[in-house]
Amino acid sequence: MTHNRIPALLGALSATLALAVAAPSVATAQPHAAAQTLTGYWQDFTNGATALRLSDVPTSYNIVAVAFANADPNTPGAVTFSLDSGLSSALGGYSDSDFRNDISTLHSRGQKVIISVGGQNGAISVSDSTSATNFATSVSSLISSYGFDGVDIDLENGINPQYMAQALHQISGASVVTLAPQTIDMQSTSSGYFQLALNIKDILTVVNTQYYNSGTMNGCDGNVYAEGTEDFLTALACTQLQGGLNPSQVGLGLPASSSGAGSGYQDPANVTKALDCLATGNNCGSFTPPQTWGGIGGAMDWSINWDAANGYNFANTVKAG
């Protein structure tokens, strides 16, 4: 502010100056950081969670990952996908045509639908140029056939960062590329998954690390943190942010309910606090990050079906911010 130096005006300006001085305390209040992107997995199988048609997914989910495409037993590196017959029966005859129409419905709502590859029991191996090409060709075919917007990599039994990066760069029609590593996979830039994330940084949408089924891990400050706490989220995400990923490429993956994972569930309010902490420095736990990263990527849950069984508590809490 520039102060008027004419003494005769000082009295007249005193009230205005008082208001002007008071105003910054309101204007500079730290914003609450809602999730930039909320990703959820839609289960193409039944396991006790609420069975859902794809069109049942609420609009609070920006990215819907269809779980899962599996290894093609006849072609190394390639993947296949089909609607699960058990799910179809549970939904009273949900057909492939219904599923395809539902993808169009989600698109009309502004939601992205991607095909997730692998999962806990996935046995897909991309370890050379041939398998990389086979992977890219098969995923491109699924994108073209179903109208998927991209692909999610959820390989939990090892990954080759060189050839998977080659494969992902070869995919045609993918506007969304996400990764879902386990916490151990993102402890250091020397790990395969972290290398992959950096190798595809030019096309990467977000890395939704699974902050569950983990046990204790090191944070960016070298201290050990236990899953199920806000500090576990912020201290480990800090490692990724310091390791070269853009803030928008770092997401927090959690179980949607206590039934969604063996360990690591925590109140979705903690996820919102963690996003705030990383983006603004507010609502931190014991760990305070060395800096803030505006535009943090958001959150992910396993799964939309488990969230539905829990009254969509995760989506309603995290998306509302």
Residue ranges and their predicted role:
Residues M1-A29:
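Secretory targeting and sorting signals
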Residues Q30-G251, A256-K273, P290-I296, W306-A320:
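Chitinase-like catalytic core of GlcNAc-active glycosidases
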Residues A274-L275, N283:
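N-terminal onset of structured domains
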Residues N283-P289:
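Short glycine-rich, acidic/polar surface loops and turns
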Residues S303:
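Residues that scaffold, gate, or flank divalent-cation-dependent active/transport sites
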